[in-house]
Structure formats: structure tokens, C-alpha cells
Design a protein with these regions (language model features):
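Gram-positive cell-envelope targeting signals
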Residues: 1-74
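Extended, well-structured beta-strand/loop surface patches
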Residues: 51-107, 112-276
Length: 276
């Protein structure tokens, strides 16, 4: 669909820019030193640094380690756990147990998987598609925030899941909220702040949600893709809307419904978007 193709184009664009950047750096490293060396030699100045320059020097590819700053290891013991998750936000310890996971797609659909763990400084983004069907060693600590986007399900499997340490609380909200086409509404003003499943009642589109702090400063904007023609993309689960969050539905054919999510981690909704 449009979302998948756009994600693929963005991914290819990022890869293309990275390749161009690397090529430019290589050219600069290989060409500039000899030119400067000749210039300095012609002016009578010594250029010992460039005379000793090693053209055969190789640069190791940098590999990002998302777990470089963790302060504790996950327990090797635990329960065997496997669950399929559709698109939405999931809090580790509330919606999914702590553990070391293998995340698998179906080999056809495109997914984006994001893990943000402020306490352990883990920030991970992975694409799961026909090329990358499986992502291994996904370490999810209690309190981490996991986001899934795409059509279908991602399967999360672990052999050390800490199911006995999970905790949650029922959502205090009980009433749904309708948002019509080309309508904008504010949490805390037009409807109660809280945690909702954003559902496409009819149509398809990409509503955007802007989050503000208590001073009115914009923190982030979240862009969703939902469609009533898909069993999994018709809902984005566990969308946290703190006081002042603005949801803008600018699509003329999209009707939305905010349905209170079943369970939540906390009523401190703004903390999901802030850093201590």
C-alpha cells in the first residue's frame, strides 16, 4: 500500500545518502593530502605529516551497539513466551514481559520496529520486510517503549520472559470519542487525556498527533497510518495522549474513533514523551 511504498522509498533514500557521504569522505581522504603535500613542498615548507601518510589505511565499518550503556543483564531464566503484536505502542512489563526476543515478520509485509528505553539508553530502529524477516537479540527491559507500524503482525518470542513481574492497571477511561473528517481535537479540552486505541471507522489516511509539554512547547509529532480495509491497520493501539495533545484528522474521507485501551502502565501520560 501507499504507506509501505513510502517507507521503502525513505529507506532507500537514506541508504543512498549514506553511500554518497562515504564516497565523498573516501575521495577527500585519498585526494586532499597529496595535493596539500605538493603545495607545501612547492612553497618550501616541510610536510612530514603527509609524507608519512599511509594510503593503505583501512577504516572499519562502524557498528552501533544499542546495548553499550546497559547497567544490568537480563535474566537467562524465565518462561517461554510468544505473542503476535499488530501496530501500536507497547510498554515492557505491562503489555509484553521483559526478556530477550526474536522478532519475526511474515516475509512479505513491511514493518518498522522501534525500541526506546530511557533508563538503559537503548534506542533501536529496525525494518522488518522481505529482506530482513527476523531480528534477533532484541533486549526488552521493563519500562521500555516498543512501537510497531505496518500491516499484519510481528511475532515476539522469548525463552526468558519475566511473566511473573508484569503489572498493569485498568484504564480509568470508559467512553469513546469520535473525530470526523478534517477535524482537529485536543486532549484535556475536547476529550479526556489518556490512552486510546485509534480506530479507522471508515476510510483511510494519516492523522497526525502533536504532543506538547506543560509549558506548551512542542515535544514531538506522531504520524499514523490507518485504514478500514485492513484487519490490523484499522487500529493503532495504546496511543498515549497527554493533556494538550492535538490530533488532526485532515483526510476528507477518514472517520476516526478513540477507544480507551484496555490496560495502561500509568496515568502519568506526559512521562512517555519526556526525559528525566
Amino acid at each position: 500500500n501507499t504507506y509501505i511504498e513510502e517507507e521503502k522509498r525513505r529507506r532507500k533514500s537514506r541508504m543512498g545518502k549514506a553511500v554518497v557521504f562515504v564516497v565523498v569522505i573516501i575521495l577527500l581522504v585519498s585526494v586532499v593530502p597529496p595535493i596539500l603535500s605538493q603545495f607545501l613542498s612547492g612553497s618550501g615548507q616541510e610536510a612530514p605529516f603527509f609524507e608519512d601518510y599511509d594510503h593503505d589505511y583501512t577504516y572499519e565499518d562502524y557498528e552501533y551497539d544499542p546495548y553499550a550503556y546497559v547497567t544490568r543483564e537480563l535474566s537467562a531464566d524465565g518462561e517461554t513466551y510468544s505473542e503476535q503484536l499488530a501496530q501500536g505502542n507497547y510498554i515492557v512489563g505491562t503489555h509484553i514481559p521483559e526478556g530477550t526476543y526474536i522478532v519475526e515478520g511474515d516475509g512479505e509485509s513491511f514493518f518498522s520496529l522501534t525500541v526506546e528505553d530511557k533508563e538503559n539508553s537503548i534506542y533501536m530502529y529496525e525494518s522488518v520486510d522481505e529482506e530482513t524477516v527476523k531480528v534477533e537479540d532484541v533486549r526488552l527491559y521493563a519500562g521500555a517503549e516498543v512501537s510497531v507500524s505496518g500491516e499484519g503482525y510481528l511475532r515476539f518470542s522469548a525463552d526468558n520472559a519475566q511473566t511473573g513481574q508484569m503489572s498493569s492497571q485498568p484504564n480509568p477511561l470508559t467512553e469513546s470519542v469520535r473525530i470526523g473528517a478534517e477535524e482537529t481535537m485536543t486532549a484535556g479540552g475536547d476529550f479526556p487525556a489518556g490512552v486510546y486505541d485509534v480506530k479507522a471507522v471508515s476510510g483511510y489516511g494519516s492523522p497526525d498527533i502533536t504532543i506538547y509539554d506543560t509549558d506548551g512547547t512542542e515535544l514531538t509529532t506522531v504520524y499514523l497510518w490507518i485504514s478500514d480495509s485492513s484487519d490490523t491497520e484499522n487500529v493503532y493501539r495504546n496511543m498515549i495522549l497527554p493533556q494538550g495533545a492535538v490530533i488532526a484528522n485532515m483526510d476528507e474521507a477518514l472517520e476516526l474513533e478513540l477507544i480507551p485501551s484496555e490496560t495502561i502502565a500509568s496515568e502519568d501520560y506526559l512521562s512517555y514523551y519526556t526525559y528525566d
